[in-house]
């Protein structure tokens, strides 16, 4: 059965495609135009995840394993791909994968099929009812589409004939879907970007962040996006990503509080209140919005601005009030935007010791210096700046072993902020140097065993010698930074494209990169990571450091690659939020088991230590006032309460022996 007439393309087997697909981590970057390539034509037209590169990863795995049978929709999925190469450019930038080969393999597979091999998918009363709400095109129970939602809301190894996928385009349709599902006693769950679901798909939290049967409400079509410069606000639908909002806001010299580029903004508000390095200045939780429209579990539509509703901003705190499922679906929000200043600059302060970096961060945070503030680990810095995983590892090795650069305090602010930082710091890394490191990352990593670094490492203070002394100019000269140099690290056929990408000013503008957040997905290069953490009161430095060390000890206990990710101040420096990252092979069940243990153990120990608002306390409290989530500052729990905590987890996640 021919898929595309008169087109000859490279033959790729399902087996070869699966080798690529297994490395995919569902970061969602293929659904935003972050490199100026445009969007996948197939995904943009058809909507369902199966038509996007991300969804084809799951589709090809199930076809190869014989777990699904081909249907007419598989032909449409195969034919709709134009082999335009957009996905290769996007995915190679972030994860070094080539997903177009997966699409080619599906086309090759379909070409071997006979019409008689196509399975029919019966339409039942539930599907007919859903189609009456959204139209025939936007509701389906076809396994070839359903399978694409595996690992991003549907658990692996589950029966696909138990699901319906529906794509509403309005709040009213979401309400009708929920009422219809309730009428027929069918469970439902909304899906936005699916990143949180993807991260938890390999370990025990999947039981909380997935649907074992029922209706998946894919919110992608709720794409309303309006910028209101006169009030510095924006109206944002549930299908709008952070990148899309930020791009629209920047056209008016405005900025949204952001987390990750591919995250859907409304969902990001609901899930965690937007954890961001800009949060000390712009706020968190209910600070993010003026009003929201939401649909509850009964299908009732409300707004925060409705007169007479119960207090929508108050939250009960403590482990007994942890919730792992949202009680409402935010379908639209009016969110706050903030001015972009003409004199914004980036300045990094390098440190050897975490305590010194944290001390600098708190000084700046409590004085409200800077717009974006964070301590970043050398690992984070290396991952973000490096075009490949190997370069990032060499970059990190040089930072730690030659430069004694283990941490940087990252500051995005005005020139006035820069002056304050430079007065406090012995040495800094400015925008020109950061640009050189981005464009010279391959050459920098190649210095690993050089005489230059050996001599530098023998200095009493390598950081000061390099960044505040004459050796800086020698470093920059040796880097020979250029778009051509970075582009050569990519596959030959993509080098011309990436030379153009790295020639764009924004790709080396650290302030822009902080605002648009397109680099953090490099943490998901062909592997997964889990990032537990939380907020901690900043009144006791030793307590903070002991808390962070606890995460490191747990990582060592389970023999996982791990690193502190970032620390950022909140509430004028009264708190800091810390993310600690554990890296693992998402295809290895044993790794998934270890990750589940680390998550639960670190959360439990955080409750025991006290003065910590854990990530569990954050979940689905994003619409509340931050003061109601962060305060009162919690004391450590007792042994009796530890037992209660485990019982609570077992009621949601199953017995402890399954963790």
For each predicted feature, which ranges?
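Short amphipathic alpha-helix segments
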Residues: 129, 356-393, 543-559, 595-603
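Conserved phosphate/anionic-ligand binding catalytic regions in large, soluble enzymes, centered on
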Residues: 26-32, 83-96, 313-334, 569-571
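Long, structured ligand/cofactor-binding scaffold of large enzymes
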Residues: 151-255, 268-277
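C-terminal cap/substrate-recognition region of VAO/PCMH-type FAD-linked oxidoreductases
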Residues: 334, 345-352, 361-504
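Ferredoxin-type iron-sulfur electron-transfer modules in oxidoreductases and energy-metabolism complexes
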Residues: 2-21, 36, 43-90, 94-121
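Conserved oxyanion/phosphate-binding beta-strand-loop segments in alpha/beta enzyme cores
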Residues: 52, 128-154
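Conserved glycine-rich FAD pyrophosphate-binding loop
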Residues: 2-22, 44-55, 156, 160, ...
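FAD-binding subdomain of flavoenzyme oxidoreductases
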Residues: 224-228, 236-367
